[in-house]
Amino acid sequence: MVPEAWRSGLVSTGRVVGVLLLLGALNKASTVIHYEIPEEREKGFAVGNVVANLGLDLGSLSARRFRVVSGASRRFFEVNRETGEMFVNDRLDREELCGTLPSCTVTLELVVENPLELFSVEVVIQDINDNNPAFPTQEMKLEISEAVAPGTRFPLESAHDPDVGSNSLQTYELSRNEYFALRVQTREDSTKYAELVLERALDREREPSLQLVLTALDGGTPALSASLPIHIKVLDANDNAPVFNQSLYRARVLEDAPSGTRVVQVLATDLDEGPNGEIIYSFGSHNRAGVRELFALDLVTGMLTIKGRLDFEDTKLHEIYIQAKDKGANPEGAHCKVLVEVVDVNDNAPEITVTSVYSPVPEDAPLGTVIALLSVTDLDAGENGLVTCEVPPGLPFSLTSSLKNYFTLKTSADLDRETVPEYNLSITARDAGTPSLSALTIVRVQVSDINDNPPQSSQSSYDVYIEENNLPGAPILNLSVWDPDAPQNARLSFFLLEQGAETGLVGRYFTINRDNGIVSSLVPLDYEDRREFELTAHISDGGTPVLATNISVNIFVTDRNDNAPQVLYPRPGGSSVEMLPRGTSAGHLVSRVVGWDADAGHNAWLSYSLLGSPNQSLFAIGLHTGQISTARPVQDTDSPRQTLTVLIKDNGEPSLSTTATLTVSVTEDSPEARAEFPSGSAPREQNKNLTFYLLLSLILVSVGFVVTVFGVIIFKVYKWKQSRDLYRAPVSSLYRTPGPSLHADAVRGGLMSPHLYHQVYLTTDSRRSDPLLKKPGAASPLASRQNTLRSCDPVFYRQVLGAESAPPGQQAPPNTDWRFSQAQRPGTSGSQNGDDTGTWPNNQFDTEMLQAMILASASEAADGSSTLGGGAGTMGLSARYGPQFTLQHVPDYRQNVYIPGSNATLTNAAGKRDGKAPAGGNGNKKKSGKKEKK
């Protein structure tokens, strides 16, 4: 600031100069001479010869009344009229003359008369480094809590250096320590101030106080400095320090704002209660000089108001530092900065006019598409009338200026209606005044839709499970599909397509609602007819071009118990009579009832029971096998004709059933009848008969030939069957010849007793000893069957047939799991135990496999090709006493018939796999050999 006396002198000088200029305007224009001298020159220091420099005559100076007419500045310089030299007359202190102005100039006015002339002399006072930096206090004390986090800043006292330029204050230095670092900041007026930054957490117990030294350095040569001792006391303070809601506040005030005008209110909060939460506001310690004279701060409310007179030409921006402390015992301070901008009055805001708007805009509009034209006007002049426009950042639009105050709104990025269907653009126009005034207008831009999204679904495929015999027309699936496009492009149409080579499935079985995607069945579905459907749902939208999506729909039909069991044997409507000799012991196998069910799983599991007979105590039936046997010995008092009604029930819910009727004829006990049911241990009386030896020789020769032929056939068939599926293997010759393996399979199926094989049979009407023998030792086709099973599925082979993994062509010992126990084997009098408590198969797969194999053997017997010693369809029994088991083929019965299990479960085959010989296997072989010898 220029001293008031110096300003008054300048004003007086200006008035004199103005008068002289008016008087001498007609004579001669004034001349300006420039000099530069350092400050603090001693009195009498020669500045320059002004007379010579002005071209005046030295001898006429007195006559022309040469004099210095400047006001306050004339005391600093004098002119020697004898020599014309101008010299320093008083101490020149640049800091006193010009303060902090970057340039300091003293102007002198010289006047001569006759004629009147006015001359101006400007002397630039150059700064020298003659002032040390100085701190306003001798020392500084800080109280810092040990809980202060590293990185916290603490403002320090600012030093002041009256010099300017490089001679002014340039930097600060801090003595070395392990806790604090110094950060030197620059104000907007280029002055420096220092902050103390905590780099390492304090520990009051370790160091309760710290002594630091702050040094201020200027840029002169040599550099001058000043030091400020800093005493830091480490305190245990309250938990929470005040916190400003923002670290930087900005305010703008007019330079003619009166005293008391509110500038801004700072706000700090403290989470503590009581005195520790009461905040006191104060100015920071490093504010520039003059801030406290121009502004006032309310200690309680934090309101900053104007106190003095603001001068825009002096300072345009005030940087004020405010600290807040609580009233706790160890208060911690928070600091914020307030920027107060002093501006000239700018009382006209811009005005925005939207001349045209192109809306809606297609979402596929190219970049640079013009959306709107805007014109902006401002009644102010100069910089206050220069206007700029802008749109918020992050939007796909931009403003460009084509002419002055005219702007074009264009697209700058791709539009997406599905993301943002409409924009309300806030266009802001600002002038260049200080403070800048602005205007805001809203431009509404709608985005129109194009068909750029296909129908979408949460699932790419659906698996639907529906129970058979469903209600036609009932919904079975509702497709969840949507299209994010606009309604006109999102109108969906649903169609069903067929997969694979099958056609007609859609029209026969299913339909879909074209509008809502609900799939319905046209007819009741039948599990036994078809179990799975593969469809494709085709969904298209209503846009142009049409976009579509395909969804796979797999429909699985589940089974219901809708089929009652059917009787395979005895044949319904036929006459089946089973022969039973009198005197037969308990447990004798009389016959077997065979049923099947077209359902699957538990719905196809069958159980057998007797409904009624003339003598309830004579017969018993296996619950799961259907085997009918004698429950007690046949007595003479029993009726010669017994009619049995067997109830066959499945395991479904609700259970369905059917009945089968079987007639048993009780015959007189005779030698012929006993010959047909001989005892395994009874000696044969005809061993020495010549006919027996002749037949035996013939059989041995025949067997040798048959074995050779079958060996070749089995080898060829074995090679061919290795690549075939198990279910496609031929089964017509499965039980044609007896043998150990055939014996095991027959017993496993529960069809007959093993003692019905390798026996000598006589017909009831025979009058001579003509034994009928089966062909012993013939090569069994079952070996080829077993090799095929082993190659297709070794695990199933071992479980079902109980065979070892023997080399092809080698018969494994029979699995005793499928044999009857000794007590259950019928002898000559049929002593088999009739109480069969066999277990169910483990799963549906095992059930259906056993059904297919055993029914294949039953079909073999029905064809009349069995060589088990009986007549056509007798399953190996004699023509007189065997059941007439002629089967009728039922479509698909091989896949659905369930023949319940035997006396052993499939899991017992583990002993076979473990390498243990099945119990009773060798005994059966020995018994068979004894029979053949006899």
Curated annotation (Swiss-Prot):
It is a single-pass type I membrane protein. GO terms for biological process: homophilic cell adhesion via plasma membrane adhesion molecules; nervous system development. Residues 924-934 have a biased composition (Basic residues). GO terms for molecular function: calcium ion binding. The chain crosses the membrane at residues 694-714. Residues 1-31 form the signal peptide. SUPFAM superfamilies: Cadherin-like (SSF49313). Glycans are attached at residues 245, 424, 478, 550, 615, 689. The keyword Lipid biosynthesis does not apply. Residues 32-693 are extracellular. It is found in: Cell membrane. It holds the Pfam family Cadherin_C_2. Residues 812-843 have a biased composition (Polar residues). Residues 715-934 are cytoplasmic. Residues 32-135, 136-244, 245-352, 353-457, 458-567, 572-685 form the Cadherin domain. InterPro entries: Cadherin-like_dom, Cadherin-like_sf, Cadherin_C, Cadherin_CBD, Cadherin_CS, Cadherin_N, Protocadherin/Cadherin-CA. One of its GO terms (cellular component) is plasma membrane. Keywords: Calcium, Cell adhesion, Cell membrane, Glycoprotein, Membrane, Repeat, Signal, Transmembrane, Transmembrane helix. It comes from the Eukaryota. Residues 804-843, 904-934 are annotated as: Disordered. Potential calcium-dependent cell-adhesion protein. May be involved in the establishment and maintenance of specific neuronal connections in the brain. This is Protocadherin gamma-C3. It comes from Pan troglodytes. The gene is PCDHGC3.
